[in-house]
């Protein structure tokens, strides 16, 4: 965390190195990537170990060399999170390792809690089946966007769903609506043929209904 001039407005800038975890929480075995539990998750530690083992030699070589983050206490924090001591040089920054109290594995839960706002509820997740969305959600999308249907209506990746449904979207004008393992509904549409403002309006008007269901995010994904 970099802190601004406190004599000015007392603001703090919270900089998040996303997806670089330093160790799994005690309940990691309750969360999965496919069929694999998150037990033993430690992205940063595994990267450092791969570098030390000579398994990360493309474009670089040797042990992980991150002097600025190391000085701030990155290696100390990783060791603490995994019940080890760190014998390297003392850190010049203030460091620590925190255990999340929010149940969500998603981005908003983690970021909100880092900013001091834990999430004491369970997010809503759409099932990994087709159709993924209940009829009332599909109906709301169609009414707001003034369309007669939606495309995808399933769990999908961003690039794959555009490849699969992009041509049909351009031809039929129906928005591409999909979700993932996160608490999210993503809507992709062409910013000219569908309209950027129309897409943003759709997501903005749809969001209150989905937030009432405890869905974390409604994301607009315009494409060219």
What are the functions of these language-model segments?
Residues 8-13:
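Extreme N-terminal starter segment of soluble prokaryotic enzymes
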Residues 170, 179-181, 192-196:
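Phosphate-/polyanion-interacting regions in eukaryotic proteins
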Residues 1-4:
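Eukaryotic N-terminal low-complexity, Ser/Thr- and Lys/Arg-rich leader segments
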Residues 189-192, 196-224:
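Extended, H/D-rich, highly charged conserved domains that either
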Residues 16:
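Generic enzyme active-site microenvironment
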Residues 21-173, 184-190:
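Active-site nucleophile/metal-coordination loop of metallo-enzymes that catalyze phosphate/sulfate
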Residues 178-182, 220-223:
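Short, well-ordered beta-to-alpha junction loops that form the rim of enzyme active sites
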